[in-house]
Amino acid sequence: MTAHGFTLFDTTIGRCGVAWSDRGLVGVQLPESSEKMTRDRMLQRFPAAAETAPPPNVRIAIDEIIAMLRGERNDLAAIALDMDGVAPFHRRVYEAARTIPPGRTLAYGDVAARLGAPRAARAVGQALGRNPFPIVVPCHRVLAAGGKIGGFSAHGGTATKRRMLALEAGE
């Protein structure tokens, strides 16, 4: 996935980033421990991208992400994603995760069952652990069996996941 540009922006959980191509977002970055580390992570993920002002469609996506993280019920389904280079199974997992409404959760096994692969819960978890579009592909809404929080690969780990779920629940 080749990004043309990226930008950082403020949210209730910290300074996030997005990178984009002509076809949509190619990546979303949750906050690192500092703005510098978030920027460095974006440069690491998208070395050919320039930090620049976003085009109008990306500005709209950023505004929707900010609103969702403020607790507004928005599924972000209208945000275009450029999944060029995303493995077919991962793409299917991300598409299934995008159907989980804000404030709701599913287990990894539930997502696997929706894909017609009920024994693929671990593979679903691995795909979500590599999710290049956190928030827009709401991997935070997918839990381990029995309602356990499961893992979360973003900075802050499961505490960040719990915070995102609480924001969606209006807490």
Language-model regions, residue ranges each:
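N-terminal alpha-helical segment
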Residues: 93, 144-145
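Active-site and channel-lining beta-strand-loop segments
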Residues: 18, 142-144
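Short Lys/Arg-enriched helix C-cap and helix-to-coil transition segments
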Residues: 135-142
